[in-house]
Amino acid sequence: MSLARTLFIVLPMVVAALAVLILVADRIHRRPIVGAGLVMCAIGFVPVWVMIPVEPNVPPATLACFLVIIALLPGFSWRLTSGDLMVATAWGLVGLSVAAGSPLNYVLSDLVFGALPAYLAGRLLVERLGLRRVAEVLAIVWIAVSVLVLLEAVTTINPFSYITVHNNLYEEWSPPLARGSLTRVEGAFGHPIALGVCLAAGIPLILATCWRPGYRIAAGALVLGATIPTFSRSAIACAVIAVILSLMQVHTNIPALWRMGFLTVLVGVGSVLLPYVLGVFDSAGREQEDSAGYRGDILVLVRQLNPLGLSSAYQKSGDSVAWGGYSSIDNHLLLTALRFGWIPVVLIMAGLLVYLARAFIQRSNPAQIALLSLIPAYGTVAFITQIGTVVWLIAGMAASAQVSVLLESRNNTTGGGVGVVAGHANPWNRIRSGDWSCRAFAGRSVRPVSGADAGSH
């Protein structure tokens, strides 16, 4: 085919695609809630193997994050927190690690097309919409994903596996996995662990929406239940921790009776399901033991870490990579340290410790609780498929919500330190003054009430 004919066919397609992208970006700029929905739907309903066949291969959720950045970055306030500076420092060290021998493709895949767009998207969306409105969008998508997952568990049919794209990612992630004699659910996430961990990350945000307590608890229970047929110990543990940590926080705003009832039902149902789940794990037998043993064996690679740059354990033969003889590193903290050095990892872990301290003194926001609930996963699974996008998206949401805490301190207000709405008047001030409406939680303007009405609260 001649060059002229190729251009005649390709150029109109490129122009049409650009026109669509511009229209979508403009829509997101005018209504940021559209951007939140686009990102959440790309995570929950588009498999990672569905991507444009052009190098570099960019996951669909990352493309959605880039669209949000293009649309909302011009209006960014540039109010930065200590968390932003810590993350930026860690990323800067990751960039410098290239000079210390780290391959550039690791920086591109993990940072440029991974952590960076997801973090910025979460940061921008929460600044424009407030944490609870973004949480509501996530909750709706996560509920839909959970329903599909439970249907998949009953029927053993995963409709997303029928979305055929002839590439290496489809061959790697579309085949179903089993534990013992049972097929594990995967949804659009390509792996049971990825599905379960991402669902668990959404539970604190679901419980922090402005819905009625019963609706929030039902949604949280549904998502928690959807992690069980993944038969992933890490995912189930993360989900349980997410529920417990969320119910311990005052910002959840769920009455004590509802909390106790939820925990009682959780313990009761858990005691019934636990023998069944343990039976599935026992039927896996050697597979489960080998998996746990392997995760312990790879810890010997800690001895070969460098402060900055590629580990001496790096081995490459053709297209295959190994680390000290281990071809797979099921530990994201360790894998990151092997690729870029242990200093960036220590910085991120220090940030998690700060979030943990804030949780103990009731000063954390729901996104921070979500990050804390995933602690069991950070050391037991790599950030495969959509996990990295979800973690860094929530990290950006947590940082943006924290901005409102700084505004409270600067303005000598008493907003409660939860960072519900960043960049706007904190609604907790209204709540403390007696306004318990959903509008206050969403950061919308509230019509002033008369003295008589105010006294009726």
Question: Where do the PLM segments sit?
Answer:
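Transmembrane alpha-helical segments and their membrane-water interfaces
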Residues: A17-L21, L67-S77, V94-V149, G351, ...
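N-terminal signal-anchor transmembrane segment
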Residues: M1-G75, L96-V98, H332, L374-Y378, ...
